[in-house]
Amino acid sequence: MTFAKIKFSAQIRLETGLHIGGSDAFAAIGAIDSPVIKDPITNIPIIPGSSLKGKMRTLLAKVYNEKVAEKPSDDSDILSRLFGNSKDKRFKMGRLIFRDAFLSNADELDSLGVRSYTEVKFENTIDRITAEANPRQIERAIRNSTFDFELIYEITDENENQVEEDFKVIRDGLKLLELDYLGGSGSRGYGKVAFEKLKATTVFGNYDVKTLNELLTAEV
């Protein structure tokens, strides 16, 4: 019986400010209109695994779906086996586990004199009819922040012969994300990211990851 778990790790570097919204259920007068999601323990920005998974799946659907899928449950088999499918007749658990990504270079930012790991960007919309202004404050994780990124991929008898194909899809997803954006307001310059120090490691069982590491660093 084959059973192994592969950890895919990388660093996400923010090339522009990133906004992934947090809770604004309570906002005092003068507070930021749209705060970013933060770790409740440290109050430092995080990148939720759900945001990474959802964005990557959406981008890959444009490549690997033969037709436009109205819902994720209508995705192609290759995406369903990686990300999961909740549709009754096609239900399956995904082979990928996405972890939340936490800030990893706080000390470096501190040494540069950074006083806060977030910034506030002031934006404005103008009503074209009334010329009324609608100013708002958007919080962003700052440029040059890096976050530890981690995926867990499970290998069993069922997918032992599909591992390399799956990792090519993962590689494509990372490249597409670099060419797109993460979080909100990407068309206005937010959320440009780069994946660095890509590495696959066997963390349970026996599996030679040499070929996988070659795939991850190959040009798309």
Curated annotation (Swiss-Prot):
GO terms for molecular function: endonuclease activity; RNA binding. Its EC number is 3.1.-.-. Part of the Csm effector complex that includes at least Cas10(1), Csm2(3), Csm3(5), Csm4(1), Csm5(1) and mature crRNA. The Csm complex is elongated and slightly twisted with a maximal length of 215 Angstroms and a diameter of 75-80 Angstroms. It has been modeled to have a central protein filamant of Csm3 subunits along which the dsRNA helix of paired crRNA and target RNA binds. The filament is capped at one end by Cas10 and Csm4 and at the other end by Csm5; ssDNA is thought to bind to the N-terminal HD domain of Cas10. Changing E119A: Wild-type degradation of target ssRNA by the Csm complex. NCBIfam families: cas7_TM1809. Keywords: Antiviral defense, Endonuclease, Hydrolase, Nuclease, RNA-binding. Its cofactor is a metal cation. It is an enzyme of class 3 (hydrolase). It comes from Streptococcus thermophilus. InterPro entries: CRISPR-assoc_RAMP_Csm3, CRISPR_Csm3_endoribonuclease, RAMP_III_fam. Target ssRNase is inhibited by EDTA. Encoded in a type III-A CRISPR locus. It comes from the Bacteria. Changing D100A: Nearly wild-type degradation of target ssRNA by the Csm complex, crRNA is shorter, Csm complex is altered. This is CRISPR system Cms endoribonuclease Csm3. Changing E139A: Wild-type degradation of target ssRNA by the Csm complex. Belongs to the CRISPR-associated Csm3 family. Changing E123A: Wild-type degradation of target ssRNA by the Csm complex. Pfam families: RAMPs. One of its GO terms (biological process) is defense response to virus. Endonucleolytic cleavage of target ssRNA by the Csm complex requires a divalent metal ion; Mg(2+) has the best activity in vitro, but Mn(2+), Ca(2+), Zn(2+), Ni(2+), and Co(2+) also support cleavage.
